[in-house]
């Protein structure tokens, strides 16, 4: 199993000549979670939040690549991953940017400066309809970029017995990258899903993945992740059927 995830990597850390590569790891479905970062109306929809502000300023063309990638690549791939994870008993966890109070005074200084305001209960705080949580799935609020720094995610994962995290979402080189680094520093096994993330430009996305891969995480495509999960399921020992005498 460990050899499979190592062998599936066409990408490698270009600094590997000095630093040791990230060791291969196994995946246990009951100890794994798909973490979807900030795919909400605030920053992932053309008509709300950041998208609406870009239209107001007449700069919407600057973000066309970003929103197109979310619509045509990221959302369809996350839908596939959600379906598989739900079938296989893998936790699906949503991180969202939101404030606890209506005036947003509780969010970080960076988010205040960037005007990333999404009061709880607002449309901007909602997860995109196409990938919305189903009953009993966790939606965790954060008030800054990092999933760990801005919430009690670490404690929740410990309570769930989670060891492996599969990250998808936006923005690749901002909230996603921060969360991946923090997860690595907390000794989680981390997979970053290449075609489950989006940045404002292809270059920003690619550079973030090059920096993170084989150091803080293993970068994989959706199809690679699906194959990895299915192989892990197949490798699980099966309980023998009870026999009657």
Residue ranges and their predicted role:
Residues 35-37:
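Short hydrophobic beta-strand that contains or immediately precedes a catalytic carboxylate
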Residues 43, 64-70, 165-166:
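Surface-exposed cleft-lining segments at the edges of enzyme active sites
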Residues 47-67:
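A solvent-exposed, charged loop/short amphipathic helix patch at secondary-structure junctions
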């Amino acid at each position: 199993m460990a050899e499979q995830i190592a062998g599936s990597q066409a990408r490698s850390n270009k600094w590997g000549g000095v630093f040791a590569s990230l060791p291969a790891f196994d995946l246990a479905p009951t100890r794994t979670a798909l973490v979807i970062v900030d795919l909400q109306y605030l920053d992932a929809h053309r008509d709300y939040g950041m998208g609406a502000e870009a239209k107001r300023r007449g700069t919407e063309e600057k973000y066309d690549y970003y929103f197109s990638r979310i619509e045509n690549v990221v959302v369809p791939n996350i839908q596939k991953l959600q379906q598989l994870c739900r079938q296989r008993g893998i936790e699906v966890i949503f991180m969202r940017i939101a404030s606890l109070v209506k005036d947003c005074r509780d969010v970080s200084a960076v988010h205040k400066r960037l005007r990333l305001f999404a009061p709880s209960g607002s449309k901007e705080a909602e997860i995109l309809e196409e990938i919305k949580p189903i009953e009993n799935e966790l939606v965790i609020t954060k008030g800054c970029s990092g999933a760990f720094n801005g919430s009690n995610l670490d404690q929740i994962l410990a309570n769930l017995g989670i060891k492996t995290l599969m990250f998808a979402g936006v923005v690749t080189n901002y909230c996603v990258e921060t969360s991946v680094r923090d997860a690595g520093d907390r000794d989680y096994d981390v997979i970053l899903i290449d075609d489950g993330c989006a940045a404002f430009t292809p270059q920003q996305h690619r550079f973030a993945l090059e920096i993170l891969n084989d150091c803080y995480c293993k970068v994989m495509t959706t199809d690679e992740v699906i194959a990895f999960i299915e192989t892990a399921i197949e490798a699980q020992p099966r309980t023998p059927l009870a026999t009657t005498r």
